[in-house]
């Protein structure tokens, strides 16, 4: 006998908002209780219809998709209704938030591999179900994978999902599963090559690519670089946030030191997902049979090793908002500039190094790039293909260079003010060293413990202490002078 579906009220008065737990460009997510349902805790996604890029029909499609799908790894919508100029979507509350928030708050260098396998297998179950139902998700990433305190994992956010076919046989005797989508949707970091070049069309395998990028995101703590900000923007971001845009510096550097080791099965699985040719990528169903998932742990394992010590979703959101406010908002011009670069500098391909689980983007040549390469450049290009451990050039490091300007394999950059950049980076390095010294002084003062330091670090701290004392004396002198004048 079918179980009766709970009927949630379609009235805002029936819900009591507790706190905000997420925010986006056109939507906010709240923790709330449904009063008529014995104060059941729910999540409410409030979409501003005036701010949303999607039209009302698209939003209705999202909520319809969420309500019709039934799978333990899919986040269902209980109901949806309009409140003033907002669409409220009532959903289950996932107390640990998204995998993105978990990784960024507690595992910035990436999750342990045995935990990654659990999260990925649960997500893959959801993708397999979606594809069986004729749906592409089109925006698979850690931010759309939600986790509850019991370890349950649910794939969410169907704002850009699409039905690629009706799972029935047409009158001609062939299914319409061969239909391919051509509109661009999703987040640039996770976009499959065929989605970027959407004029060629794409299908279910685009989700498999995004799944592979998500695996890298969980392994390294962030997705691979997808666009190159200009030099000014890069330096500004380094100074303001210390969130380096040059992904390869952080990841390949740590790999060389041996800090991150990945099993052969994991590397092979990711490699299959990141095949350039979508026809060579396995289906979600086939991928579930890969050896990487064979000895996968249970949900209780991630509860014990990942979730038990985490802050809850509302605390993580509050902490993230405090961090954002502390570093200040980015300049609007910079954001517009970066958006334009994302638009105009889409990736044309990827170079995947399976040995250290790294993915480097390849960008199409710009108008300023020469259409013909010199023999020397062609030789260098051949060398680069033969050597997996080539020197990272200024282009790859995100210094705002064109592809042509960064061809030199020895790191030499043409048409680039190297001295100016070096000068700015040295100033930044010095500033960071002084900040580190100050932090060490504060830690020592609060804890009473003395860390083992190198001679250079001791000298830096000594200089910093003298500076602080000098600043204090200056303030005392100024106050004394002011008092004498007033007296």
Swiss-Prot record:
- Enzyme Commission no: 2.7.11.1
Cellular component (GO) terms are: cytosol
In this chain, ATP is annotated as bound at 21-29, 45
Chief location of this protein? cytoplasm
Keyword terms, alphabetized: ATP-binding, Coiled coil, Cytoplasm, Kinase, Magnesium, Metal-binding, Nucleotide-binding, Phosphoprotein, Transferase
Residue ranges for the region (Disordered) are 363-389
Q: Where is the Protein kinase domain?
A: 15-293
Classification via InterPro entries: Kinase-like_dom_sf, Prot_kinase_dom, Protein_kinase_ATP_BS, STRAD_A/B-like
What compartments host this protein? Cytoplasm, Cytosol
The subunit field of the Swiss-Prot or TrEMBL record says: Interacts with PHOT1 in the presence and absence of blue light. Binds to BHP.
Catalysed reactions, semicolon-separated: L-seryl-[protein] + ATP = O-phospho-L-seryl-[protein] + ADP + H(+); L-threonyl-[protein] + ATP = O-phospho-L-threonyl-[protein] + ADP + H(+)
On tissue specificity, the annotation reads: Expressed in guard cells. Not detected in mesophyll cells.
- Report which superkingdom the organism of origin falls in: Eukaryota
SMART domains cross-referenced by the UniProt entry: S_TKc
What sort of enzyme, by top EC class, is this? transferase
The entry summarizes the disruption phenotype as follows: Defective in leaf temperature decreases and stomatal opening in response to blue light.
Q: Which organism is it from?
A: Arabidopsis thaliana (Mouse-ear cress)
Looking up PANTHER family in the UniProt record yields:
SERINE/THREONINE-PROTEIN KINASE FRAY2 (PTHR48014), SERINE_THREONINE-PROTEIN KINASE BLUS1 (PTHR48014:SF7)
GO MF, one term, reads: metal ion binding
Q: Name one Pfam family in it.
A: Pkinase
This chain's function reads:
Ser/Thr protein kinase mediating a primary step for phototropin signaling in guard cells. Essential for stomatal opening.
Q: Which family does it belong to?
A: Belongs to the protein kinase superfamily. STE Ser/Thr protein kinase family. STE20 subfamily.
Protein's recorded name? Serine/threonine-protein kinase BLUS1
What this protein needs as a cofactor is: Mg(2+)
| Residue ranges that the Swiss-Prot or TrEMBL entry lists as coiled coil | 450-477
Which residues act catalytically here? 139
From start to end residue, where is composition biased (Basic and acidic residues)? 374-388
